[in-house]
Amino acid sequence: MHPGDGHTAACLIGWPAAHSRSPLIHHYWLRTLGIPGGYSIESVPPEGFAEFVLNLRAHGYSGANVTIPHKERALQLTQPDDRARAVGAANTLYYDGDVLRSTNTDVEGFIANLDASAPGWDRTPHAVVLGAGGSARAVLFGLLERGIERIALANRSLERAQALADLFGERVVPIAWTDAPAALPGAGLLVNTTSLGMKGQPSLDLDLEPLPSDATVADLVYVPLETELLAEARGRGLRTADGLGMLLHQAVRGFELWFGARPHVTAELRALVEADLAAK
């Protein structure tokens, strides 16, 4: 199915964008929900991004996902919601009448994955977040929105952690990376937003022994599916939430905005994406 054939179509805009799993996810939902629609990949260089986005309908699309390196620029070219503004990046574009709006679905993807993987995780008042990059901003916004009272934010650059604390308020407490172990006792949630533990990256060296026995450990990395951090957490009997779950759940909102039906993250969909990851 192609843009302009009379059916609703959305796309992923990136540079490059060829290895995204988004088409696999959205085509699965279109097929299983019986919706005539399409989802394509559009590789658009930075110098052509503004023209493409501002003429999205002329290109045949009613909405889009946006990935690297365009997410900050997308924020400037659209009418962003509070989540996109707080995160500082937009990953989902949609029309509200003739107004092109944007949001960041990483926030609800992260929270929905926690809800599905570890129901009741939000009963804890304290959390520890590792890393202070773009992903951390989405995580912090979601945790604060959900009512977490205190978040220790550990980063190798304390200045970057302090900058996010200044942005999000006094409930976010910046700490040195080496102080992360001391923050674990009493923390009901630990979240890794760094690339440590990803295939080809150094391991995340952190002893989970100080965590409470009912804590939840989340890792945004999904290659490998089970990082060393998650393996250790499971070995200790802790509940876990992996990066693939977040990837799947963050796609839900965009699909709903474009195609008018709210899809579900199913075991079948997860198995489909796992098989695709294993084949690469």
From Swiss-Prot:
At which positions is shikimate bound?
Answer: S20, R21, S22, T67, N91, D106, Y222
Recorded metabolic or biological pathway in which this protein acts: Metabolic intermediate biosynthesis; chorismate biosynthesis; chorismate from D-erythrose 4-phosphate and phosphoenolpyruvate: step 4/7
GO BP terms in the entry: amino acid biosynthetic process; aromatic amino acid family biosynthetic process; chorismate biosynthetic process; shikimate metabolic process
Q: Which reaction does it catalyse?
A: shikimate + NADP(+) = 3-dehydroshikimate + NADPH + H(+)
Annotated positions binding NADP(+): D82, G131, A132, G133, G134, S135, L220, G243
Give the enzyme's main class according to its UniProt record, as a single word: oxidoreductase
Q: A single GO molecular function, which one? A: NADP binding
Q: Which family does it belong to?
A: Belongs to the shikimate dehydrogenase family.
Q: How does it assemble?
A: Homodimer.
Q: What is this protein called?
A: Shikimate dehydrogenase (NADP(+))
Record lineage: Bacteria, Pseudomonadati, Pseudomonadota, Alphaproteobacteria, Hyphomicrobiales
